[in-house]
Amino acid sequence: MKVYKKVAFVMAFIMFFSVLPTISMSSEANGAALSNPNANQTTKNVYSWLANLPNKSNKRVVSGHFGGYSDSTLAWIKQCARELTGKMPGILSCDYKNWQTRLYVADQISYGCNQELINFWNQGGLVTISVHMPNPGFHSGENYKTILPTSQFQNLTNHRTTEGRRWKDMLDKMADGLDELQNNGVTVLFRPLHEMNGEWFWWGAEGYNQFDQTRANAYISAWRDMYQYFTHERKLNNLIWVYSPDVYRDHVTSYYPGANYVDIVALDSYHPDPHSLTDQYNRMIALDKPFAFAEIGPPESMAGSFDYSNYIQAIKQKYPRTVYFLAWNDKWSPHNNRGAWDLFNDSWVVNRGEIDYGQSNPATVLYDFENNTLSWSGCEFTDGGPWTSNEWSANGTQSLKADVVLGNNSYHLQKTVNRNLSSFKNLEIKVSHSSWGNVGSGMTARVFVKTGSAWRWNAGEFCQFAGKRTTALSIDLTKVSNLHDVREIGVEYKAPANSNGKTAIYLDHVTVR
């Protein structure tokens, strides 16, 4: 129920309100055995960390957000998420679909979003990829909503057939993109052929809630063919395979390719009542794999008024084996509905900067302010500072504080340094402001560094941040020259013209990764 799906909202759905039984995962699942024994160590570490999240008391469900489709920027959705919630999602998603019609069906596959995924990964996040695959029953165009007849579906695994050749060419195009990510050290939560129990994609059912075993077998064969080709021929050892049917249709496990071909089981859910999915959840976790909500959002009729806090409450109360969720974009997105702050700031939720799977590039703390200002200074202050303060902190009990006068002004907190940061890819600083004063349309801030003998200015994107809430600002250091000679690190704050009075700005927990 996305990609602008015009599927009618169906309420002919049986609600299950039974008490959730206690279901535990086997030792194999807890031991996080990937389907691919040759998976690289980073991928094994990510999977093991995800699989064991339900054993924690807090910070146990990774947040995610769909960023968009290839050949379109994903930056705006990251900006919206951070401005509204003060957090960056732990997982960023892209779909390898190209919306522009191409002359050959395989060219509808595009991995133009890879660089943004690489950047997000280097900044401490995880990535997931879906593919709204074009229809191999056609030579050109996408036709992804046109059902492929079962007889043609069965031809896919015979690469000598017309459909099989097109299928193989599409696999090659996807594999090229996934291989580029592998070469950049990126592990991918790979989610192909999703919502197969629905009737809206070519690989799905032929009618509403229809099930045909022959067609299901064709689906399973196609999945396994893709898996074998990617894993054994293309040597893609960076993939975690995600199987995700839709909650609105039956037969959620009837298309399951098998434990040797799947690593995570998930549900795509655009249901008005997230608490009523117990039956589907129980069926999925009975497959003995880590569980996720691979897509969440409101039904079409509730887009714009849906309360996303219902999802995190439902996860906590009814679906405790959930290891991640992924909110969709556009009118289904948290920032176009209600409850975004509650969703991303719950104590159970893991956001970017909090992911710790034993990666080789953990965050290194440059500055905290538990004892003193550490020689940080500021400018454009008319009301004093900086000092240390316990009024707000991102880590520990103290932060750096300065009092400022609002009204179309800018301010800087900075540290003059002589540092070599050439071995790092990302710099992050957490900020906030006090609750007093009228900030008008909202304050913004960005991280900056000055490098080289000319003190060259380099800055991240401006981001709006809220009072008494933590917002993580960052700058991509891979785009900064002379990192061996960093002269200054700091944050530039701006108050809008329609602000007035006085407030305090804060800064804390300066880290590099």
From Swiss-Prot:
One Pfam family here: Glyco_hydro_26
Keywords: Carbohydrate metabolism, Glycosidase, Hydrolase, Polysaccharide degradation, Secreted, Signal
Localization per record: Secreted
First-listed, main subcellular location of the protein, grouped into a coarse class: secreted
Record has Thylakoid as a keyword: no
Annotated signal sequence range: 1-26
Active site residues according to the UniProt entry: E195 (proton donor), E295 (nucleophile)
Reaction(s) the record says it catalyses: Random hydrolysis of (1->4)-beta-D-mannosidic linkages in mannans, galactomannans and glucomannans
Residues in GH26 domain copies: 41-353
The keyword Secreted appears for this protein: yes
Swiss-Prot/TrEMBL GO biological process terms: polysaccharide catabolic process; substituted mannan metabolic process
EC number: 3.2.1.78
Amino acids binding substrate: H132, W200, Y270, I429, K430
GO cellular component terms, semicolon-separated: extracellular region
EC top class named in words: hydrolase
Site entry: Plays an important role in maintaining the position of the catalytic nucleophile: H194
InterPro entries registered for this protein in UniProt: Galactose-bd-like_sf, GH26_dom, Glyco_hydro_26, Glycoside_hydrolase_SF, Mann_GBD_bact
One Gene Ontology term of the molecular function aspect: mannan endo-1,4-beta-mannosidase activity
Biological function: Could be involved in the degradation of glucomannan and catalyzes the endo hydrolysis of beta-1,4-linked mannan, galactomannan and glucomannan.
Family per record: Belongs to the glycosyl hydrolase 26 family.
Additional record remark: The production of the two beta-mannanases seems not to be caused by proteolytic cleavage.
Protein name: Mannan endo-1,4-beta-mannosidase A and B
